Amino acid sequence: MSSSEIILITGANRGLGLETARQLLKKGFTVILSCRDSHKGNEALQQLQQEGLSPAFIPLDISDPKQVQAAYAWINNQYGQLDVLINNAAVTNVVNTHRSERESNTLLSGDVAEFKAIYDINVWGTLELTKAMLPLLMKSLQGRIINLSSELGSIQLQAATSSPVYHVKKFGYNSSKTLVNLITIYLQEALRETNISVYAVSPGWVKTEMGTAAAMLEIPEGAAIIVKAVTDKVGAGSFFTHHLQMIPW
C-alpha cells in the first residue's frame, strides 16, 4: 500500500474526524479535510499545519448536492483519483433546534421533520457523497469506503434486553445508523467484483462533542480503529467495534 494514497474525511474539523486525519497524516497519507463550516475547517487546517502536518481542506456539506459535485470536481482536478473515503460526518439531532436531543430523537416525542433532518446528513448525504466519489475510487488500486456507524444502529442489540445499549432509544440517530449499516451491506455486494471494499466501523463511545465527556474512550482510541481499517483493510463487508469484534447487524 502506497503512503501517498489520497483520503477524504468528512466532518474533519473536530473530534474523531480531526484526530483520524492527524493519525493518517503522521503515517504519510495525503489527507483532505472537509466539513460544512469553512471557518472551522480552516481552523482545523491551521491547527494541523502548526503541528508540522500538511493536509488539504475543502468546504463540503454532504447534504448539498452542489457541494458534493464541487468536491468531486476539485479532487478529480487535484489528484485524479481517491483511495479512501471516510464517511464520518453525522449529527445526533436537528441542528439549531430549540428542543432537547431527548425530545427530538425519541420516537413518540420527535416528529418526522426532525427525523428527516437527521437522515438528510447521516443517510442521504452519506449515500450521495459515496455514489459521487465512486468514479474516483474506481481509479484506486485498492479503494476503501469506511462508514462510521454505531452499536446503537444494530437492530439485534436494540432488541435484546440484555444488550448494554438496549435502553438508548434515540430513534432518529439510531435508525440513521441502521440505514448506514444497510448501505454498507448493499455497497459491498454491488462492488464485489471491483477494487473497492466497504466497511462499517463503530469507534465506541468516545469523548467527543457528540459523545460527551461521560464517554468511556478518549478520541485517539476511537480514531485508531478507523486508521486500522485504512491501513490493514480489516473486516471488509462487516460491522466491527474498536476492539475488532464483529457487531450483529
Language model features with spans:
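Catalytic loop of short-chain dehydrogenase/reductase
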Residues: 91, 95-119, 138-192
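C-terminal helical subdomain
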Residues: 178, 193, 200-201, 208, ...
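Canonical Rossmann dinucleotide-binding motif of NAD(H)/NADP(H)-dependent dehydrogenases/reductases
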Residues: 2-32
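A glycine-rich helix->loop->beta "capping" turn
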Residues: 51-54, 74-87, 91-95, 109-111
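Hydrophobic positions on the long internal alpha-helix
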Residues: 86, 129-133, 137, 183-184
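The beta1-alpha1 cofactor-binding region of Rossmann-like NAD(H)/NADP(H)-dependent oxidoreductases
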Residues: 38-39, 59-73, 112
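Conserved glycine-rich Rossmann-like NAD(P)H-binding loop of the short-chain dehydrogenase/reductase
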Residues: 27-43
